[in-house]
A protein has these predicted regions:
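Conserved N-terminal ligand/cofactor-binding loop architecture of enzyme catalytic domains
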Residues: 28-110
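Short loop/edge segments at beta-strand edges and connector loops
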Residues: 143, 186, 272-274
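Donor-nucleotide binding loops and adjacent catalytic segments primarily
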Residues: 200-205, 209-285
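A short, glycine/small-residue-rich beta-strand->loop->alpha-helix junction that serves as a flexible
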Residues: 16-25, 225
Length: 287
């Protein structure tokens, strides 16, 4: 075992729990590498903002949901400002200087054969710190935003960028990445989503849902968006047509508790964070 570990290639994923998609994408990539290469590849995931960032970046995971839900204008302002090329260049340089102590510590503690970023804020300053310590170790970016991706995702110096869609691929080329380094790879998904699925009836039975038409309402890992009013509208419509609604609230425990206490007009099933999403999707007629 020690000999295998010594010979294994080491891949380190740079992520942060600002939303559920970044960690999920890293897990999907690590799962695929294990299926393809077994113990020949060892994967590690590092929440770089939480463990190596200074305040307020170190609390980004805790701040993310309140920011998006309660101060969305500020979140949109940040995205808009980051899309201004010169402004973002200044921010990236400032972050490099501001966070260099933690970045150097991360680079020293996590040597690897490949670094993969699955987070928009981890493609510039971390790349700089890693390139200084390991000048020949490749660095890749896998974009986990679907339809569009803000400028922080695009570092023309990375060795490979995997775009989630053709629009993101075009944006990467406009940002200065050479065509040979841009791959149209799509979104990473866990193998369970691609495997053969149970029938809706089988999935509903496994989840102890009633055997009736089912709509599934999702808000991502953090349970974001207008889930509560949408659930109210859907529940009323489905009740009048003999259907049922399942609402997955993710890590938003306040929302889950609130919805679970409500009196619904029909069959409504409320869950928090789940690790069997393929089964829930198989049970649904509408997502």
């Amino acid at each position: 075992m020690r000999r295998i570990e010594a010979m294994a290639k080491r891949v380190v994923f740079l992520m942060s729990d600002t939303g559920g998609g970044h960690r999920a994408s890293a897990h999907a990539l690590a799962e695929a590498l294990h299926v393809l290469h077994g113990d020949a590849v060892q994967c590690q995931m590092v929440d770089l903002l939480t463990h190596y960032g200074t305040w307020p970046l170190s609390h980004a995971g805790a701040y993310y949901l309140p920011l998006v839900e309660q101060h969305r204008w500020l979140w949109r302002l940040g995205i808009g400002c980051s899309n201004q090329a010169r402004l973002w260049q200044a921010v990236a340089l400032s972050a490099r200087l501001w966070q260099r102590g933690g970045l150097r510590r991360f680079a020293a503690e996590y040597p690897a054969d490949l670094y993969v970023s699955v987070h928009p804020l981890l493609n510039h300053a971390p790349w700089w710190a890693l390139r200084r310590r390991y000048p020949h170790t490749p660095f890749a970016t896998v974009i986990t935003d679907l339809a569009s991706a803000p400028r922080p995702w695009y570092n023309p110096a990375v060795d490979l960028l995997s775009a989630s869609c053709s629009q993101v691929q075009a944006a990467a080329l406009r940002a200065g990445l050479p065509p040979a380094r841009v791959l149209l790879g799509g979104l990473p998904i866990r193998l369970a989503f691609a495997a053969s699925r149970p029938t809706p009836a089988e999935a509903r039975a496994a989840l102890r849902l009633e055997q009736r038409p089912t709509a599934l309402l999702l808000g991502g890992g953090e349970g974001m968006g207008a889930l509560e009013p949408t659930a109210a509208t859907l529940a009323a419509r489905l009740a009048s047509q003999g259907g049922q609604l399942a609402v997955i609230c993710g890590r938003n425990e306040a929302l889950r508790s609130r919805l679970a206490r409500q009196r619904w007009p029909g069959a409504v099933h409320v869950a928090g964070y789940v690790d069997n999403m393929p089964l829930w999707m198989a049970a649904a007629d509408l997502v």
